[in-house]
């Protein structure tokens, strides 16, 4: 189940965009070979709130666009399909029969700022940040150049499937 919870009132987000986020997350999970019932929470917030969370969780006292809180552990350089695709999850991993992949906290305010800065649509920015974060929940990272190239390629492949271009 995908849970999208809009906890801010500074930026309007329409039902079509929310539905696109839901669809794009489900597509990404399928493409990444996540075949079990899953739970992903997407919490939409403002800049002040994400700054607080960033300070509390990462000790970085500044606004960021999106934060990912994965529930599964991955060996360095490995993703869900390499580690967990055929894994038999016991009850400790499940919540009411769903595998909890993690939480995504996204600042719609920052997404709007970045969409203007980068010269593309708000929809594109919100979808990009969401997919970026979903891939983090699935073990992708971008700390090393080779990992970054792989992650960026996956992000663009998923966005292109939905005709979401820069």
From Swiss-Prot:
Cofactor (UniProt): Zn(2+)
InterPro entries per UniProt: MetalPrtase_cat_dom_sf_prd (IPR023091), YbeY (IPR002036), YbeY_CS (IPR020549)
The keyword Hydrolase belongs to this UniProt entry's keyword annotation: yes
Keyword annotations: Cytoplasm, Endonuclease, Hydrolase, Metal-binding, Nuclease, Ribosome biogenesis, rRNA processing, Zinc
UniProt main location, coarse: cytoplasm
GO cellular component: cytoplasm
Pfam short name (any one): YbeY
Binding-site positions, Zn(2+): 132, 136, 142
GO-annotated molecular function: metalloendopeptidase activity; RNA endonuclease activity; zinc ion binding
Entry keyword annotation includes Metal-binding: yes
Enzyme class: hydrolase
Domain of life: Bacteria
Family per similarity comment: Belongs to the endoribonuclease YbeY family.
UniProt cross-references to NCBIfam families, sorted A to Z: rRNA maturation RNase YbeY
The protein's name in its UniProt record: Endoribonuclease YbeY
Organism per entry: Clostridium novyi (strain NT)
């Amino acid at each position: 189940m995908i849970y999208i919870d809009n906890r801010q009132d500074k930026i309007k987000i329409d039902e079509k965009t929310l539905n696109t986020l839901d669809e794009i997350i489900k597509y990404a999970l399928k493409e990444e070979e996540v075949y079990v019932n899953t739970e992903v929470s997407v919490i939409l917030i403002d800049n002040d709130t994400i700054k607080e969370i960033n300070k509390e969780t990462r000790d970085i006292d500044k606004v960021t666009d999106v934060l990912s809180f994965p529930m599964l552990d991955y060996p360095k350089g490995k993703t869900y399909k390499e580690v967990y695709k055929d894994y038999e999850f016991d009850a400790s991993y499940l919540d009411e029969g769903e595998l909890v992949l993690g939480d995504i906290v996204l600042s719609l305010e920052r997404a709007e700022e970045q969409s203007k800065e980068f010269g593309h649509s708000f929809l594109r920015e919100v979808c990009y940040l969401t997919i970026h974060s979903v891939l983090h929940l699935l073990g992708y990272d971008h700390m090393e150049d080779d990992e970054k190239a792989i992650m960026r390629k996956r992000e663009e492949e998923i966005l292109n499937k939905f005709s979401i271009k820069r």
